[in-house]
Regions:
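Charge-rich, low-complexity N-terminal segments
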Residues: 1-102
Length: 102
């Protein structure tokens, strides 16, 4: 299983790009894959091909009307381990003995 953290935004659409980010989030939400939106990007959990197809779909949507796109990705692969999107946070919280702000 893969945890993929990524952000994608156009460089040629000015300072406010939430319209374009929202389009990507619509694609991510409709994918059915577990995800977590953060202020700086989105974390998605799935098989390699699933998460890469999701990035491709977001890119294709954005490239319809954007000439320059910045994408950052960080990938964590762990064979056979599911539920890490929440499990990694729960593991840290259990060691601290309290719930953290997420």
């Amino acid at each position: 299983m893969v945890l993929l953290e990524f952000s994608m935004s156009p460089f040629d659409k000015g300072a406010s790009v939430s319209e374009y980010v929202a389009r990507s989030l619509d694609i991510i939400d409709k994918s059915g894959l577990p995800y977590q939106l953060t202020a700086m990007g989105t974390i998605v959990e799935g098989e390699w091909d699933e998460v890469m197809a999701l990035v491709t779909a977001c890119f294709k949507s954005m490239s319809r009307d954007c000439e320059r796109i910045s994408t950052s990705m960080k990938i964590d692969f762990r064979a056979g381990k599911r539920g890490r999107l929440k499990g990694k946070i729960q593991s840290v919280e259990s060691k601290l003995g309290r719930t953290l702000s997420t």
